[in-house]
Amino acid sequence: MINHITDNQFKLVSKYQPSGDQPQAIEQLVDNIEGGEKAQILMGATGTGKTYTMSQVISKVNKPTLVIAHNKTLAGQLYGEFKEFFPENAVEYFVSYYDYYQPEAYVPSSDTYIEKDSSVNDEIDKLRHSATSALLERNDVIVVASVSCIYGLGSPKEYADSVVSLRPGLEISRDKLLNDLVDIQFERNDIDFQRGRFRVRGDVVEIFPASRDEHAFRVEFFGDEIDRIREVEALTGQVLGEVDHLAIFPATHFVTNDDHMEVAIAKIQAELEEQLAVFEKEGKLLEAQRLKQRTEYDIEMLREMGYTNGVENYSRHMDGRSEGEPPYTLLDFFPDDFLIMIDESHMTIGQIKGMYNGDRSRKEMLVNYGFRLPSALDNRPLRREEFESHVHQIVYVSATPGDYENEQTETVIEQIIRPTGLLDPEVEVRPTMGQIDDLLGEINARVEKNERTFITTLTKKMAEDLTDYFKEMGIKVKYMHSDIKTLERTEIIRDLRLGVFDVLVGINLLREGIDVPEVSLVAILDADKEGFLRNERGLIQTIGRAARNSEGHVIMYADTVTQSMQRAIDETARRRKIQMAYNEEHGIVPQTIKKEIRDLIAVTKAVAKEEDKEVDITSLNKQERKELVKKLEKQMQEAVEVLDFELAAQIRDMMLEVKALD
């Protein structure tokens, strides 16, 4: 782990003061951390300000903090909130940078090799580099991460040792700087200037760090000495100011110096010889030939370029690790005494525990059939016990802590009172007969009051059918499914809050951390279908989605009341009783949360254009909308005639959205 010398302080900026039972929760958590307690649970009901409590704790204990969330949507939301609370500190975002990812795999039954295929999101890659560089430069850092943080990342020591440090007056030739940049995987491109690239114009070298997306640095030489360094606008070249020191971090997290690379290549060759001998002994000549060809190509690429596709599969040799030794991860970039907070821990812990086995079974197949060396098995996520070995102090945060958390600690700090005085919603059970028409009436009542609705179903088909039906009924509705890209998810939540649409339908995406105060109705279909999505914890989480609005109401559609339903209803009633008593004692009238609607993370231009298109539609008058519907109908017919039914369906959905505005 990395240790720092700097001693920056966290500075919490908020117009709020702790209220309700937040002050006691903050005090207990801080006292326990300062007293050396390793693990504790913050059991906070939905909407009680758990994120604010977490921020207060981080500010008071002043430790670098890793906040782990179980999905990218929740991580994006937390990132936005922490950035607002800590504008002067480094708040970073670290999730998987793949918009699409098909891992390398082999299916022996059909003799099918599936090559790794992926689409990397440039914005998220930039944020990942920003996170690791911040951890090496300062100690006032909060990293909000998904479970990606337990996957192999490359050695933090190699990463830190590879930093190119520049300052005015430094004696270094221009060519030496260019070589140093190439060594840390920067690419020279004098025409297309992007992140992770540099360009040269005479005695001027312009460098675009991997952790930036708008600003680059211009290094001006006088002979073999740096004359000055300027920060510039990458697009226009406008000078923003001069800098006294510039640290250029590697353009990739998997970086190795020349000496270590030679040692690594020797080890890869030795392992290749061993594995070829094993295959030949077993009569697996095809596998031996395949492995020899692939590995020798990779070795040649590593020797000539210092990099190859799938370089992470050789990370054990490049890091100098022993067989079976855990890989370096984001956790190794933190100092020894850092703090971990696991948000929605009842979900996140399950993911941390399950990642290793799925990865292992896929890679074993690749090794057995000669697609990878056995050392590829050590490019993997951490096991649960390996993750635990990184834990110095940890806070599990959840409205419904799981069995694992309760086994780790008996220290449970409850936070039930909401600062706004909001109560847990009233829950009622209605029969399934006529449920859709009943629900339609409830939605229309909310639309009239400019309130939003969440609907959770059990199957993808039901969610799609329900969405189509409500569109036909003139409801502005969207379906949030698992195929939606990372940054689009946060945009959907934002659009719901802005009123671009009124109803959001989903399966398992609505339960934890989707923070929409405008939602006053949560409808749970098939509430009596006992299982993962309808157990006690799941139902309590779903009920909590309506707890941020003073008109919050939950309808469970079911023909019988299961034990899980009853326990969830009873727990909600218990909390509601405590909250009502507190409000009565302090003369508090419940008020819906007023929360600023903001862009959580900068989105791509394509998404921005799409958003502009939606804004234009809403600004059209009735006659213009009528003409637009006619045009869309014509386009839909043309798409059907050329058998492009997918396009036709998209146009149909757009048409229904326009009609819903009337």
From Swiss-Prot:
- PANTHER family hit by this protein: UVRABC SYSTEM PROTEIN B
- Under what name is this protein listed? UvrABC system protein B
Q: Which residues form the Helicase ATP-binding domain?
A: 31-188
- Main location per the UniProt record: cytoplasm
Q: Which GO terms describe its molecular function?
A: ATP binding; ATP hydrolysis activity; DNA binding; excinuclease ABC activity; helicase activity
Motif Beta-hairpin covers 97-120
Q: Which gene encodes it?
A: uvrB
UniProt record, GO biological process: nucleotide-excision repair; SOS response
Q: Which residues form the UVR domain?
A: 626-661
Tell me if DNA damage is a UniProt keyword of this record.
Answer: yes
A GO cellular component entry from the record: cytoplasm
Q: Which organism is it from?
A: Streptococcus pneumoniae (strain Hungary19A-6)
Primary role: The UvrABC repair system catalyzes the recognition and processing of DNA lesions. A damage recognition complex composed of 2 UvrA and 2 UvrB subunits scans DNA for abnormalities. Upon binding of the UvrA(2)B(2) complex to a putative damaged site, the DNA wraps around one UvrB monomer. DNA wrap is dependent on ATP binding by UvrB and probably causes local melting of the DNA helix, facilitating insertion of UvrB beta-hairpin between the DNA strands. Then UvrB probes one DNA strand for the presence of a lesion.
PROSITE patterns, per the entry: HELICASE_ATP_BIND_1 (PS51192), HELICASE_CTER (PS51194), UVR (PS50151)
Query: What's the record's remark on domains?
Result: The beta-hairpin motif is involved in DNA binding.
Q: Which residues bind ATP?
A: G44, A45, T46, G47, T48, G49, K50, T51
